[in-house]
Amino acid sequence: MKFVDEVEIRVEAGDGGAGIVSFRREKYIPEGGPDGGDGGDGGSVYLQADENLNTLIDYQFERFHRADRGTNGRSRNCTGKKSDDLIIMVPVGTRIMDVDTQEGLGDLTQHGQKILVAKGGFHGLGNARFKSSTNRAPRQKTLGTEGEVRNLKLELLLLADVGLLGLPNAGKSTFIRSVSAAKPKVADYPFTTLIPNLGVVRPEANKSFVIADIPGLIEGASDGAGLGIQFLKHLERCRILLHIIDVMPVDGSNPVDNAFAIVNELHQYSPKLAEKPRWLVFNKIDLLPADEAKALCEKIAQELGETENIYSISAINKSNTQPLIHDVMTLLESMPKEKFVETTDEEVEFKWDTYHQKAAKKSDDDDDWDEWNEDDYDVEVVYER
């Protein structure tokens, strides 16, 4: 299935049903009075996270989603039926943003988590609501308010503990194959990896973490070179970054320059992402004698100004990968996930709330129902026995 991590959709909540004007008409009950019922509330639209989904491809072709309208009221004080809410299922890790206001509505980071994105319209009132001691035959009613309409941008951000960084052909996919059951494509040409891949690493029987492999970056990626930096967003929720460095690039380039290019692209994309713990992992040391490989790695680390969290491995034959995995697991256990979950106490203001508050205020300011007179509307009410 094609991996799609960004789509735009339009959601429309249902309008509220209208109230009606009706009067009770029964034998032996003269002047029965008003009995017009209220309408029903319109359906709201929710987004809910589902762990069984892993792509947003369905919403590339199904962009419009509308909840049903509430039904109108009926006579005998019968209230209209409230419409059912519309629930749209999305993958866990989906971020929701209003396209028009650029307002962040929330992140769905847990299975079953649900967020209201468009509130249904409020029901209209029937004429029974307007009866009073001075207005016994009211002919007023209100229509239901309109449901909220939003244009939403959905972004899928992978939920991983560890993210892999590096140039194309640095050995990221080979590394994730060697430490997990994931089987991303591996070949001897650049940009073999075109979409992010996830793998579950189990250092011990009851311990595990998720590692994410994204397409390689190149110098100028922030300006659109290569596949760009669009996939870096999948590392935003990672707690540790592993910077895979090829000590023997096939093009003869300098590993130090290559490493600085990746760090520069990281800073241009997000200074916050660049501040995450980043470990250097020198790969392909099997291409050199042990002494030469050790000396080269130390030289590169010195030029990069790194003195801690440096590892030398050979992903293809799994050499020195286990110590790295155990150290990663140890660090993750000391870094609770809750520390990295972005939370906000800011309440989302829905357009329906603003509309209804204004309508209620206007109704209070212009409240002249008690002064209503049938003669003002040239209506004659005749009651027959």
UniProtKB/Swiss-Prot annotation:
Its main location: cytoplasm. It holds the Pfam family MMR_HSR1. An essential GTPase which binds GTP, GDP and possibly (p)ppGpp with moderate affinity, with high nucleotide exchange rates and a fairly low GTP hydrolysis rate. Plays a role in control of the cell cycle, stress response, ribosome biogenesis and in those bacteria that undergo differentiation, in morphogenesis control. It is found in: Cytoplasm. PROSITE patterns: G_OBG, GTP1_OBG, OBG. GO terms for molecular function: GTP binding; GTPase activity; magnesium ion binding. This is GTPase Obg. It comes from Pseudoalteromonas translucida (strain TAC 125). Mg(2+) binds at S173, T193. One of its GO terms (biological process) is ribosome biogenesis.
